[in-house]
């Protein structure tokens, strides 16, 4: 497997899939994707090294030693993630924490540090935050934003084939190109 993009940032699990700044930025690298070709691997505990996470798991399992495994992860994960992580770990939900083996803990740690999600497609264009494509910047005078092909025709913003990562960059492109076009009309 080849890593196309590695990033750190915020991510949302939604009713339709993954979203948030990290996913929006990564999607630009997958625009020509074939369904099922990409897998996103998430580190659900990026602030912890594997060793630190193992120590945390040991501490939490000891603290909850008489509880069912599925009821012991509420300080580690959001409530809605717990059943998914439990299922992927292969540890029976009703297993008591004090019976979980080192091998089971290693599988759990791997699930937390390498949580995979297969990307099956993009959300519809109607829900897009940023789109790629448009008028080629090679066909536009960058000082005036006037078309090199049709005098008197000006372009600004998302009509241009320019896209950027989230964080206001697309707004800056829109403002700057709009200003340049407006100043040269």
Please give the residue ranges for each predicted region.
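An anion/pyrophosphate-binding glycine-rich loop and adjacent beta-alpha core
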Residues: 1, 5-99
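A conserved FAD-binding loop/helix module that cradles the flavin
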Residues: 161-185
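Gly/Ser/Thr-rich beta-alpha loop segments that engage phosphate groups in nucleotides
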Residues: 19-22, 135-136, 159, 166-170
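N-terminal low-complexity, intrinsically disordered patches enriched in charged
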Residues: 26-29, 142-143, 177
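A glycine-rich dinucleotide-binding beta-alpha-beta segment and adjacent secondary-structure elements
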Residues: 83-163
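Domain-scale detector for complete catalytic domains at protein termini or as standalone homologs
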Residues: 32, 39-41, 68-76, 81, ...
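Predominant activation on well-ordered alpha-helical scaffold segments within soluble catalytic domains
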Residues: 23-24, 106-109, 113, 175-183
């Amino acid at each position: 497997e080849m890593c196309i993009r590695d990033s750190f940032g915020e991510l949302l699990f939604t009713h339709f899939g993954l979203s948030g700044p990290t996913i929006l930025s990564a999607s630009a690298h997958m625009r020509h994707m074939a369904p099922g070709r990409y897998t996103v691997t998430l580190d659900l505990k990026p602030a912890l090294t594997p060793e630190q996470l193992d120590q945390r798991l040991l501490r939490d399992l000891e603290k909850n030693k008489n509880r069912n495994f599925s009821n012991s992860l509420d300080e580690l994960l959001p409530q809605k993630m717990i059943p998914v992580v439990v299922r992927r770990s292969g540890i029976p939900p009703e297993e008591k924490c004090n019976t979980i083996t080192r091998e089971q803990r290693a599988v759990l740690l791997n699930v937390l540090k390498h949580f995979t999600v297969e990307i099956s497609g993009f959300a519809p264009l109607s829900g897009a935050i940023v789109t790629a494509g448009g008028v080629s910047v090679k066909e536009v005078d960058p000082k005036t934003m006037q078309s090199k092909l049709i005098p008197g025709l000006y372009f600004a913003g998302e009509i241009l084939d320019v896209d950027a990562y989230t964080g206001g960059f697309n707004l800056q492109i829109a403002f700057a190109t709009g200003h340049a076009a407006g100043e040269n009309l």
